[in-house]
Amino acid sequence: MNEDPRPIYTSLLFERNAAIEQQEARHQTLGYVRLAIVVSGVAIVWAALSSGKFSIAWAGIPIVLFAALMVAGEQLMRTIERRRRAARFFEKALARLEGKWAGTGETGDRFSDPEHPYAQDLDLFGKGSLFELLSTARTHIGEDTLARWLLTPATPEVVRARQEAVNELRTRLQLREDLAVLGEDARTGVDPVSLAAWGEAPALLGPGHMRWKLWLLTAFGTAGFVAGVLVGIRSIGLVDLSDVGAMLCRDLFLVSILVNGYFFYRWRKPIDAVVGAVEEAAHELGLLSEVLARLEREQFETPKLAALHVSLQSDGEPPSKRIARLDRIMELLDSRDNVFLRVLEVFIMWTPRHALAVEEWRSHSGTAVRRWLTAAGEIEALCSLASHAFEHPADPFPEFSGERGMLEAESLGHPLLPEDRVVRNDIRIGGTSPHVFVVSGSNMSGKSTMLRTMGINTILAQAGAPVRAKRLVLSPLAVGASIRLSDSLQGGVSRFYAEILRLRQILDLTTGELPVLFLIDEFLNGTNSHDRRIGAEALVRGLVQRGATGLITTHDLALAEIAEALGDQATNVHFEDQIANGEIRFDYHMRPGIVRKSNAIELMRSVGLEI
């Protein structure tokens, strides 16, 4: 599919904005009508009172009409709000296509971990990050899932399943729009961790033995209440009851209060715990139910999506029906605040019986809550990748090679840069090619960007997304990067020490199952040239011996000798600049060999420093 998404988004945004204008005009008209009803109602009542012919109908009819229009107005406002969400969905999509997306979406800062081997170095989270570019998820579970995929490489089998799912979802724009609109309600109101924990928590009430006890107590309490009523109405002569009968009814009434009251207060602590927990959980499930109901209606073809769709079902029953049952239980629980039910509470065991119903719901459906959340989160994450695929139809899915520790790319570019600014390079590293590229070059020539380009496309590839390349073939890789490091005054860590700690972390990665792709910028920049040369060669040699592949950049041309020392396992490449009419120009193309010039002095002169 190579259709340009821009006209599609533009057309749909126009439709949503037109619908908003139409519905806002209708809402304004409803406001005028409500005002007219109030004015006319007051006038009619005043006239009726003045004429002495007042009837409750004169006031009742305007009140009923006003209330009906209020309800209609609230429903219309909800529709308008959802249309606005849809419009924002397409506005953000167009902003991504125009390269103006940074700062408009969710940055994923809560996932940022300075100890992660590549998250900060490759701009995974934060303003202008990969997460902000990709994420269209509107629930926390969807964001959590997408972040986990970016932070943890999947196996080729899992990646291929995701690729198939993304390819199917990329054409389902209506589904992606609906999930973005419906998920907004669930965004701030649903905590997936606590909700799943509530569903799986041990039972606070024993459904088995309590059920018959509660029904016996309800029957006994009902009989006691009826007996008490009979005693009461006998006292005013409305029923003919013997003294013995009255005494028995009175005793039954008192005993039912004592017995039911004993059990009611004996069970009060676990019952209050059940009711307190379910109030929040039921609210969260209610917010999530529309998202789940929308997914229930969709029919999927690929195995991954079909399996997720099936996982929503529990014994053939969709989550919307199960959540609806819990909603009905909650409505009955909430009605205990009714004055009449407060009087009857102890007699009919209203709260205990419905607390038990909640526990029975949890025993049948509680363990499914995590499955619902997982399925919804995965589909939202897949929809995020599908939106990216839809918006970049020329970006292919990568292929996985059985060759260990290799990456081969044709026209590889940085996905966070606007398409008109991306400069692409070819590269083959690992396998039968050199395992280490020593990248030299002048300042601002593109060395660090090349490292990030390699890393971020590897992350996309192993998450299941398309990559910014004409073609990319790679083996499964564990990425370790040392690009963006800083000192810490509070932690007592210098930049150099922070770098060697990260290098230790990268070296430790080589003990895992996957071969390592290391990306090291300005190798050992915080020490003298002699120590840097010795340390760098030893570390690179150790990485290669452990099957690692990667790139290191440097300004120190002495480090270029590392490639010669490693023979066929390493090679030198460089980026360079051109100076024309006193201006420094970069083409950002990677070339073989060692750079032969520096631009530091020219850069200092360009900002007005006297050199």
Question: What is each residue range found by the language model?
Answer:
Residues N260-F263, L385, H392, P396-I611:
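ATPase nucleotide-binding head domains, primarily ABC-like/P-loop NTPase cores
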